A protein has these predicted regions:
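Carbohydrate transferase catalytic cores enriched for Leloir-type hexosyltransferases
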Residues: 1-362
Length: 362
């Protein structure tokens, strides 16, 4: 039986998020009898570990601010991870983020390590990286040192090879798998387009919103429902200047509400210039939501023929594509049907099995 040692990095940092959902789904679904997962840490408030899979860790009640608590958790958990890398019995090490703290230890112990790369966003958009953030150099170092790399899409693999000159034979593509999160709650809004996640820079939200403004004049009841961070003051001022403040709604949605938002939306729109994979696409497919995507990055690879595509640099293309979806219930039903079929290509079982194939070769 192979023992896989995972570390605490992202489980300490994130309470919710795609990276920790990926690792939790992987660790707790490894085939019994062949692999066993070890994730040594004392403190954890990550939703997928503690709620989805029911593994309880200690927490502290004070301070209330999670950013401050996270520093305490990281201080303790990082010492535990260092000790585990140095002394625990394991066959393969699989870090959850890019701190290189373990490198000397695993090399000295001759333990192979696998690195998952979810995207190359920082490398593609370095202007968005804080000056003191060490992610780019740490990530580059780990990619060079890793025994094998898992990329979550062919697009991400191409980026690693192009940007860092990595040997492509060292990289396996393992697409994300989707695990249904929750049953849908009641319908929350009427007649809306759904936008999920961050809205900054390369996400292309404001250029897309500007492009589709004429549609509001044609469809007086249409709303744009956004999840993710609340609207900033600058965004609110812009919405007011465009006279569309009443068309933009924000919700901090739980899992059941997210399922409902997808299920009742006219369509889900993802205008981003770049993503590593795009988990919301699978969420939309699974919940019967028509999908409207940028034709950039990994989106054609993930969605295939189950989505409508637009040019994210062309305002008319963005507007016309949304108009077409909103105007045709027949088209929306066809996209729902194709999305349901496409979602079967991205099962959790398939993701786990392909990852285990990487482990088996080491």
């Amino acid at each position: 039986m192979k023992k896989i040692l995972y570390d605490n990095q992202m489980f300490t940092f994130q309470r919710f998020g795609g990276v920790t959902r990926y690792f939790a789904d992987l660790m707790y679904n490894l085939p019994a009898g062949e692999f066993v997962a070890d994730i040594p840490m004392r403190y954890c408030e990550n939703h997928y570990v503690t709620e989805t899979y029911g593994h309880k860790y200690e927490t502290i009640s004070f301070p209330k601010n999670y950013r401050i608590k996270r520093r305490i958790y990281a201080f303790v958990n990082n010492h535990i991870s260092k000790f585990a890398a140095k002394y625990n019995d394991y066959d393969i090490f699989h870090p959850t983020y890019f701190s290189p703290y373990f490198l000397k230890t695993v090399k000295k112990r001759q333990k192979p390590f696998v690195l998952t790369i979810h995207d190359m966003t920082f490398e593609r958009y370095p202007q968005d990286v804080l000056i003191y953030d060490r992610t780019i150099p740490h990530k580059k170092r780990l990619i060079a040192e890793a025994d094998h790399i898992i990329a979550v899409s062919e697009n991400t693999k191409r980026d690693i090879v192009e940007l860092l000159g990595t040997d492509p034979s060292k990289i396996s593509v393992v697409h994300h798998g989707y695990r249904p999160i929750a049953a849908a709650s009641d319908k929350l809004f009427d007649r809306y387009v759904l936008y999920v996640g961050e809205r900054k820079g390369y996400k292309n939200f404001l250029p897309w919103l500007s492009a589709i403004r004429p549609i509001f004049n044609l469809d007086p009841g249409l709303k744009i429902v956004c999840t993710g961070s609340p609207f900033t003051h600058a965004e609110q001022k812009l919405f007011a200047r465009w006279n569309i403040s009443d068309r933009l709604l924000h919700i901090s949605a739980n899992d059941a509400q997210m399922a409902s938002l997808y299920r009742h939306a006219l369509c889900f729109v993802f205008p981003s210039h770049y993503e590593g994979f795009g988990i919301p696409i699978l969420e939309a497919f699974h919940n019967g939501c028509p999908v409207c995507l940028s034709n950039a990055s990994c989106f054609p690879e993930v969605a295939g023929d189950a989505a409508m595509f637009f040019n994210p640099n062309d305002a008319q293309s963005m507007q016309d594509t949304l108009k077409e979806i909103l105007a045709s219930s027949t088209l929306r039903e066809e996209l729902r049907r194709k999305g349901a079929l496409r979602s079967k290509d991205f099962s959790l079982e398939r993701m786990v099995e392909q990852t285990c194939n990487v482990y088996r070769k080491l």
